[in-house]
Amino acid sequence: MSHYIDLNSDLGESFGNYTLGMDSEVLNHVTSANVACGWHAGDPLIMEATVKMCKEKGVAVGAHPGYPDLMGFGRRKMAVSPDEARAYMIYQLGALQGFCNQYDVELQHMKLHGAFYNMACVTPELADAVLDGLQAVNPKARAMVLSGSYIAKEAERRGIPVIQEVFADRGYTEEGTLVPRTEEGAFIKDPQEALERVLMMVQEGRVVTNTGKTIDIVADSVCVHGDNPKAIAFIKYIREGLTKAGVIVANFQHR
């Protein structure tokens, strides 16, 4: 049986005169893009340019909404009510949906950013509000969420198409969550080690945690980051390794 996998990356995170990442190069190697929607990063011109580039390169577009936290790049926890979270979703997804409509591009999915992503994995009322917002804007869009998390299970219960996401360059805890960025084992920097972990997740449905324990995991899409000079070589190494192993790399619009 052939294994399929999507490769996604967070893009469109520049702002005004400030450039972050190497989006044009990253888009040559990934199959799905998570486009920042202006609150943790990005702005209207960046959003439009990113959607246009995705269409030109045949990369699927997803919304990447975050908390309203430019200074903290959306990585700081915020205490928001369910009503606020739902409104945040509608506001940001609605903006990106407009650019998708302009260029006749399907909004394939939604993936939360930073603290919004992590908190929605373990906070039921926040996850519920996020999914309410997604369904309000685009009921057909998929939810790209941390594999095995609460929000993944709730989305499935609602009948929302789910993309179970795993990470090429992050460590996992025994609970299936990501090792916090401030702790040892949070990042996988060696490309070969990362590739071996990705192949185990994709082909065997397992991952080794930071304690050495092996846990089950479902991998529909692998996140690769493109915000540093070594990132392009890292992404290329992962994609070539997957292809050599017989894994078909494609987004969800080309299966």
Language model segments and positions:
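Conserved, mostly hydrophobic/aromatic
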Residues: 10, 64, 110, 224
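Active-site-adjacent beta->alpha loops and helix N-cap segments on the catalytic face
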Residues: 16-22, 41-53, 121-128, 147-157
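Glycine-rich tight-turn/loop motif centered on a GG-T
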Residues: 19, 23, 33-40, 71-86, ...
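Acidic (Asp/Glu)-rich catalytic clusters
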Residues: 24-28, 49-62, 101-104
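Glycine/small-residue-rich loop that forms an oxyanion/phosphate-binding "nest" at active or ligand-binding sites
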Residues: 69-109
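Flexible, glycine/charged-enriched surface loops at secondary-structure junctions
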Residues: 100-108, 205-216, 248-255
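C-terminal domain-boundary segment and adjacent tail
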Residues: 141, 233-255
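Active-site rim beta-loop-alpha module in soluble metabolic enzymes
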Residues: 148-206
